[in-house]
């Protein structure tokens, strides 16, 4: 089962209208190839507009009525570095009105991820050599 083009169009049109994002990225089961009848639709967005958590919840609920399935909306700018890297690596851009801004976000995220890996390399090395997190 794949997400239908009609459903994807509805999601894209609704989010562009409501969030005015410069980027929408589809991720999760719908792009990994195991989308099922009961799967939700995972979409990350990048927008200059700040969206409060409750408003995001209301948008997701309104989208359920539009497309007939749960929708999980993720504000890319609020996600953790690891999560952002996974979204970029495994996701599919379904809307971008500013490729330059998208490229800047991609580069910034990969730099943050590289720095994170650098910072935690010693910690992970210690865990690996001890064979335990707590040193026991």
What residue spans do the PLM features occupy?
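Catalytic core of pol beta-like nucleotidyltransferases
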Residues: 1-23, 31-33, 48-136
């Amino acid at each position: 089962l794949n997400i239908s083009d009609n459903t994807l169009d509805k999601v894209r049109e609704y989010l562009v209208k409501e969030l005015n994002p410069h980027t929408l990225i589809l991720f999760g089961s719908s792009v990994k190839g195991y989308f099922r009848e009961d799967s939700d639709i995972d979409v990350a967005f990048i927008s200059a507009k700040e969206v409060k958590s409750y408003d995001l919840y209301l948008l997701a609920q309104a989208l359920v009525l539009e497309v007939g399935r749960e929708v999980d909306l993720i504000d890319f700018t609020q996600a953790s570095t690891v999560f952002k890297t996974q979204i970029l690596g495994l996701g599919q851009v379904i809307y971008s009105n500013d490729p330059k801004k998208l490229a800047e976000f991609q580069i910034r995220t990969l730099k943050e991820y590289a720095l994170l890996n650098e910072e935690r390399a010693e910690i992970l090395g210690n865990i690996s050599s001890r064979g335990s997190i707590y040193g026991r």
